[in-house]
Amino acid sequence: MGPRAKAVCSLFILLQVLAEPAENSDFYLPGDYLLGGLFTLHANVKGTVHLSFLQVPQCKKYEMKVLGYNLMQAMRFAVEEINNRSDLLPGVLLGYEIVDVCYISNNVQPVLYFLAREDYSLPIQEDYSHYVPRVLAVIGPDNSESTTTVAHFLSLFLLPQITYSAISDDLRDKQHFPALLRTVAGADHQIEAMVQLLLHFNWNWIIVLVSSDDYGRYNSQLLNDRLATGDICIAFQETLPMPQPDQVVTEWERQRLEAIVGKLQQSSARVVVLFSPDLILHNFFREVLRQNFTGAVWIASESWAIDPVLHNLTELRQTGTFLGVTTQSVPIPGFSEFRIRRTPVRLPEPNRTSLEATCNQECDTCQDTTASFNSILMLSGERVVYNVYSAVYAVAHALHSLLGCTQACSKEVVYPWQLLKEIWKVNFTLLGHNVFFGQQGDVLMPMEVIQWQWDLSQNPFQSIASYYPKLRQLKAIHNISWHTANNTIPVSMCSKDCHPGQRKKPVGIHSCCFECIDCLPGTFLNRTADEFDCQPCPSYEWSHRNDTSCFKRRLAFLEWHEPSTIFVVMLTILGFLSTLAIMVIFWRHLHTPVVRSAGGPMCFLMLVPLLLAYAMVPMYIGQPTFFSCLWRQTFFTLCFTICISCITVRSFQIVCIFKMARRLPRAYGYWVRCHGPYVFVASFMVLKVVIVAGNVLATTANPTARPDPDDPNIMVLSCNYRRALLFNTSLDLLLSVAGFSFAYMGKELPTNYNEAKFITLCMTFYFTSSVSLCTFMSVYDGVLVTILDLLITVLNLLGISFGYFGPKCYMVLFYPERNTQVYFSSMIQGYTMGKD
């Protein structure tokens, strides 16, 4: 005997103790093909699953479930409506057998009854492909626990089961539940709708309360998984105690409820997400009212979102705003009248025996109870009711296709597995909604977020938003009446959201609890990338405090219209014109003693580069380019080196004539014969060219932008030769020191040859200004560096023009009597006689 046969054998033993249902028009309707219905008409708070007991529980002893009776009537209405149609199953009558499952207490007995034959036997066979059970399909039950139990039995026979409100995602496993389908979206969609609702109102600090059964644990785990990577934090999560079947509050339960509600009072969170069956919540909400806990937003799961009994506890309006996630309301024409219509009890049929009322097919108080709740049931709309209605129609359409109905149907034997294959294929429109089963066996009907209202003129469960499972999107949130002062949206945040440009500094273990810290200048906050760290701006950009982005810095360089530039340009023009005038004067008096003592033709070797240096001053003004930086780094410094080297060699030559010619006559002779001054200048020029070429190769001539330390909004655009500046001017500095030394040595020479004061002044100014500029540039990067660089350069040029050539021109122009050979000879003779 195989495992499957053994399982059926065990069921057969239990089946023998079960009785046939009592006759009742609400629970039984004969027909050519029967459907089974499992509904919760009565419910114990926590029923016991009687798998190990022979006695079947009597559901009528438990509390009446109004919604369960409402759903049962939907199945009856759908069957009778189909039987009255001529286009669907013509000539075929559907019947039903409906059983009260008492929530989870009475699951096994009904499914065994449905699987049995008309003679109440369930044979043990190896092949059930040609087995015909009492019913062709089962509608229900309503919760995931019961559905799982029933599905394990029905799947052995591939008997179709369509549940209308069991949302557990485990039921999508077709390897374990091949015969199970649903006309309701899964639990993941309920969670997604809740999360999107929380995000819409910026509620990132919530409390989660769950029941201690599988429903509470499963849904809370789904919520925790969904929030693991989100922006919503759970302040705390508590498990509600399971009440006693008689609803008497025990001391332990009372203390537990007091502690939970007290914790709610102390928490800063004001949004409570509650996953629990409705019967567990009565004692909890009584404790909430007793402690006068108010100002909360209650978010209900589908299990109690539209429960009329809880809604009838009108004092709950004082505790806050009630929102819930449930299925979409689809009005069913004629159903409201059918639901409250009392049907006379039919007498038992001759072929049916009235047995003991242990089969849970009676509800003495259903009619009276539903009549009292009829206004709420009518106004709440046919929500879950449509799920039952569409499930019956899905079976009818599948049977219509299987029987090959056109004008009439062939009433042949139908096996459950044949019907199951056809149910998977159905695709029809019912009351404006397309009904078909997806790959996971679900009909993705839209869901709604509802708000509880207690105003008699309004719908008690008013729709405020719609959720579309196919899009996984919550839309059209509107018409919410907040139970707060001035109808303001409640706030439930551990920390208020930071202002733009402020980063979050976490406080504690929750990412929703934080301090807001301003982003410093030069940094910005990119919330989409990282809310907890300010990002530095790129070097060419800047930001102010609390900026969310960086802006490009303004490029600063010497511009022609600036006062400092105009001043330097005027000095340059003065120097250029003065140098040009000096050239003219020296050219006209080239053979005079004054010009010859200044260097003669070598003066023009100084004046021409000096003019070129003045002419290249505009290279310092305007936006730097590669070529302007290259000219400044090469040709300008070469011109200046020529001038310095000429002054130095001239100072050395004068000292040689008066102090070394007599002591070293042969050396002096070589100096004169080999054109020592020109060789000296040429040698230093070659060395300078090597230095400049090395700098050009080692560094780039491209201009670079550096932040201005005085104004971070500015980027100073300048030539990139700062690192090479000291090395580039080292030769010039060495020449200036040598020139200064030789000039100092010649301070006792004849007056007309004594240039110590002027050369010393020029060389001292150049040395100190160059060293100071290099030092300043190494510690400061502002726009002032460029201005000082140009100003010092022009002043050095002016120092040579006026400091070295100025006195000569003054002598030539204003003291012509001293510019004679006789005067110079007398001065030399006087110096010689004085030395002797």
From Swiss-Prot:
Residues 587-601, 656-680, 746-757, 803-836 are cytoplasmic. GO terms for cellular component: plasma membrane. Keywords: Cell membrane, G-protein coupled receptor, Glycoprotein, Membrane, Receptor, Sensory transduction, Signal, Taste, Transducer, Transmembrane, Transmembrane helix. Residues 20-565, 623-634, 702-724, 779-781 are extracellular. Putative taste receptor. TAS1R2/TAS1R3 recognizes diverse natural and synthetic sweeteners. Residues 1-19 form the signal peptide. The chain crosses the membrane at residues 566-586, 602-622, 635-655, 681-701, 725-745, 758-778, 782-802. This is Taste receptor type 1 member 2. InterPro entries: ANF_lig-bd_rcpt (IPR001828), GPCR_3 (IPR000337), GPCR_3_9-Cys_dom (IPR011500), GPCR_3_9-Cys_sf (IPR038550), GPCR_3_C (IPR017978), GPCR_3_Ca_sens_rcpt-rel (IPR000068), Peripla_BP_I (IPR028082). It comes from Canis lupus familiaris. Glycans are attached at N84, N292, N312, N351, N427, N479, N486, N526, N546. Forms heterodimers with TAS1R3. One of its GO terms (molecular function) is G protein-coupled receptor activity. One of its GO terms (biological process) is sensory perception of taste. It is found in: Cell membrane. Pfam families: 7tm_3 (PF00003), ANF_receptor (PF01094), NCD3G (PF07562). SUPFAM superfamilies: Periplasmic binding protein-like I, TNF receptor-like. Belongs to the G-protein coupled receptor 3 family. TAS1R subfamily.
